[in-house]
């Protein structure tokens, strides 16, 4: 039984990673069709938030959280808005594979954060994996030097650190409870931040090509399922 749960957990993690990667890869199609990171990130927050609210309502699950947890979840929503916008901007600037490679340093960063704040130990295997991951990234950056943008790399680093923070802190809020209300609070705040940015700049860029719409819709769908 325990073995089955472990296998299921690994399968879920792999599946979520693949969905995120697919959603982020499709972002380039949306950009080529006329959209941009701000517009895409707004949709990637808003539609999953609406869908999750509907799911909770149909399930009869109150979406409320204790006050302290709610405040933390809303703060994580701001972090989520920042890291998602940074990731989608990195994908716009860098080759997709390189941007995603930088972003997927977040599991190592999550372990480091958990160890630094004293919530978990940092095992030697994680340290070794971190060294190998950063070595691989350094090699990739060296190989792709001609296509390298310092700004894009910084965006990718911000995205990885942001998701690491959200992963580390949200795990303490969720504990062994239902993660959906926490996720809803995070998505709701991220949606609000994105909408404010859209209103401030005064435009929302939708794709104007068929392939752009496929990329836009696919990115929203797959990233939403992953969340």
Positions of PLM-derived features:
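Hydrophobic transmembrane alpha-helices of multi-pass small-molecule transport proteins
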Residues: 52, 74, 78-80, 113, ...
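Helix-helix packing/entry segments at the starts of transmembrane helices
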Residues: 43, 99-105, 169-192, 224-227
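Glycine-/small-residue-enriched transmembrane alpha-helix faces in small-molecule transporters
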Residues: 1-43, 78, 82, 86, ...
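Loop-to-transmembrane alpha-helix entry segments
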Residues: 67-69, 100-103, 116-139, 146-153, ...
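Hydrophobic/aromatic residues within transmembrane alpha-helices
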Residues: 30, 40, 44, 90, ...
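C-terminal ends of transmembrane helices
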Residues: 52-64, 108-122, 167-176, 227
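Alpha-helical transmembrane segments of compact multi-pass small-molecule transporters, enriched
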Residues: 47-51, 102-116, 131-132, 189-196
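Specific transmembrane alpha-helical segments of multi-pass solute transporters/efflux pumps
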Residues: 19-24, 53-99, 103, 109, ...
